[in-house]
Amino acid sequence: MTSLWLPATGKVYLPPSTPVARVQSTDEYIQRTDIYYHANSDRLLTVGHPYFDVRDTADNSKILVPKVSGNQYRAFRLLLPDPNRFALVDMNIYNPEKERLVWACRGLEIGRGQPLGVGTTGHPLFNKVKDTENANNYIVTSKDDRQDTSFDPKQVQMFIIGCTPCMGEYWDAAKPCDADAGQGKCPPLELINSVIQDGDMIDIGFGNINNKTLSVNRSDVSLDIVNDICKYPDFLKMANDIYGDACFFYARREQCYARHFFVRGGNVGDAIPNTAVGQDNNYILPAASQQAQNTLGSSIYFPTVSGSLVSTDAQLFNRPFWLQRAQGHNNGICWENQLFITVADNTRNTNFTISVSTDGQTPTEYDSTKVREFLRHVEEYEISIILQLCKVPLEPEVLAQINAMNSSILENWQLGFVPTPDNPIHDTYRYLTSQATRCPDKQPAPERKDPYEQYNFWTVDLTEKLSLDLDQYSLGRKFLFQAGLQRASRVSKSSAARASTRGIKRKRR
């Protein structure tokens, strides 16, 4: 039997000419110590109107009551002290000439106060035309069929932990091509990435879209999101981040079901295919001319969802979470001494209804014309974290990766390039404000700007909240127990006690 040799017909893939830089995990170059700190915030409270900002009628720019809704994100920015400036008890922990200290997040607990409750939202002029699930007669629309409608939103519990802000995504109107531009046409859509800030709205069942540009009738969604952007965390982008700073880990729980089924009012933009496009009788058969069905109703169907049951059995909050291995290359290292915690929770969504008398008198009988009704929503948070002290060696490979990731980290460590002085002596004037002395330099030294000053976060200062006494705090005791540190201390204490007891008995003999 003879064999026939044939040349390879497939494509040959060659490796790239330039090597691809490999990003190291923080566990490969950071040395962890056995020193742990506990930090917790104060009781964080906020009160406001659940649907919109209440503004001053005389001055539109002045907000009298801010918008505080259970359907908003709470984006906390925790500021941690610089460990390199700590007065450590043991100064032999690290060598400041060869190492720098950083924090690593090992555990956290997001505490939430207030009882569980379901909050409703809605619109006094909601764009819906009757119920389409159990219709008794064919729907005939008019010029304005909007109704006063309310519903409960989709149930959301979520938090994302990282050392940079959480990234979100939403759909917005894109710029159309010149050939596709025109009045009354549906705009093209594009996916937008942006930072999730404190006060941004979550998806409550109508999708993560920009309602300011995609809802011109101001009636398609509820009042709390009709003039806002609903964002959803971009888990795919954060999971594929090369450094993994935006999301160490996250927890998420969402649930909803379609409760009511409606149809939108207005002209249908994309008509059902018919004879005009060569699709006659493919989708519908026309009705007789004397029937009401001869004039087709709207086919823009949509549901109003419900978050259903709210229970303590499925709560993500008021319980500890421990970080052993993050999803990315950053295993919990808090670069630049800060931590971002983005929270969404509408299981405590009760809106207070407050009634007051318009004339200041105590009413003796009910009269709705003499009563004013107000809405308020309150939220209560408390954040506790466990931090581990870690060392970063000042080696060329490590510094090169940190500089490529974020050069400001090295600037804060005062590792920047120091130029050689060109003149050993400089001029220093006295009486700078005197008319006889030359004017001082008008260009002061540039101050380092906050890279997140353009964003809105709930800043929590923990620079003076750290403690080594972990057993004095609830989260600290839980950490000692799960890490086995408490048991080891007990064994050492009991063994020391037995040794001392034996020594006393020998002396008595």
Curated annotation (Swiss-Prot):
Keyword Disulfide bond: yes
Subcellular compartments: Virion; Host nucleus
Alphabetical UniProt keywords: Capsid protein, Disulfide bond, Host nucleus, Host-virus interaction, Late protein, T=7 icosahedral capsid protein, Viral attachment to host cell, Viral penetration into host cytoplasm, Virion, Virus endocytosis by host, Virus entry into host cell
Molecular functions (GO terms): structural molecule activity
Any one GO BP annotation for this protein: endocytosis involved in viral entry into host cell
GO cellular component term of the entry, any: T=7 icosahedral viral capsid
Function per UniProt: Forms an icosahedral capsid with a T=7 symmetry and a 50 nm diameter. The capsid is composed of 72 pentamers linked to each other by disulfide bonds and associated with L2 proteins. Binds to heparan sulfate proteoglycans on cell surface of basal layer keratinocytes to provide initial virion attachment. This binding mediates a conformational change in the virus capsid that facilitates efficient infection. The virion enters the host cell via endocytosis. During virus trafficking, L1 protein dissociates from the viral DNA and the genomic DNA is released to the host nucleus.
Name assigned to this protein: Major capsid protein L1
Organism: Human papillomavirus type 49
Lineage of the species this protein comes from: Viruses, Monodnaviria, Shotokuvirae, Cossaviricota, Papovaviricetes
